[in-house]
Amino acid sequence: MKKVFFLFSLTIFFSCVSKQIVTITKLKGSPIYEKSELKLLGIDSLLSSTDYNFSFQTDNFKLGEQTPGAIQNGLANSSKGQHIHFIVNNDPYSAHYDQNFSKELKNENNVILAFLSRSFHESVKNQKAYILTQVAKNKSDEIDLSQEFLFYSRPKGVYKGDDTKKLLLDFYLVNTNLSSKGNKVRLTITQKTFMHQFLLDSWEPYYIEGLDKGRVSLKLELLNKNMDLIESDFNPSLREIVLE
């Protein structure tokens, strides 16, 4: 059973199927960080063929610092503070609290998105707060980085206790945007026999409430104005999380 709800310029959106009521609400009040920047200074390969050193610079943004309002918003929060979300080929991100770190990459083309993240894992959404690049052994393996991209960020992993009540929904858009007359993102949440769908027409952070304990599947699809799936790498995005 499922219902589809269109989320155009609303604050709270409901999907009600049988006895499970799930809500999606726009997250408000986070520091904007409109002047914050993330710069990639260099990528150096190590002796291992798959290990790389990454060097970044952050401006107007302090890694390791708690974001104002982090405790009050009720979202899962990193005790280590603000950080960089590092995503390879749209796989689950790794969090980095220093500007320099090493990563093991696969022996294939690696499309890398890195962006600034608040301590409660909400991305900083400005044109200078992210980098998109790729690391490939063979030039022929590289993809077109001018595509319209959607990268999945949150929710992620296992949530316990109070952290299960309110889940941040966050994704990162590159070379595209959302509007009531343009592209949109369709969110599908599946839990047991329940399916909930929401259509998002603005690029903002949201939070999900009303899910039961257990496994939850999420799918994000970047759609064009005709509601067709945009043909681009990593579209759609699929994840499974666990609420304990």
Regions found by a protein language model. Name each.
Residues D91-D98, M195-S202:
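Short beta-strand segments within Ig-like beta-sandwich modules, predominantly Fibronectin type-III
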Residues S117-N126, F194, L223-S232:
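Short acidic/polar inter-strand loop motif in beta-rich domains
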Residues K19-S49, V135-G161:
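Short, compositionally biased P/S/T/A/G/V-rich stretches that sit at domain boundaries
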Residues I12-S15:
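C-terminal motif of bacterial Sec signal peptides marking the signal peptidase cleavage site
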Residues K103-N109, I208-R215:
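Surface-exposed, short loops/turns at beta-strand junctions within beta-sandwich domains
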Residues F61-H83, V174-L187:
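Solvent-exposed loop/turn segments flanking beta-strands in beta-repeat/beta-sandwich domains
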Residues N53-D59, L168-T176:
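Short edge beta-strand/loop segments characteristic of extracellular beta-sandwich folds
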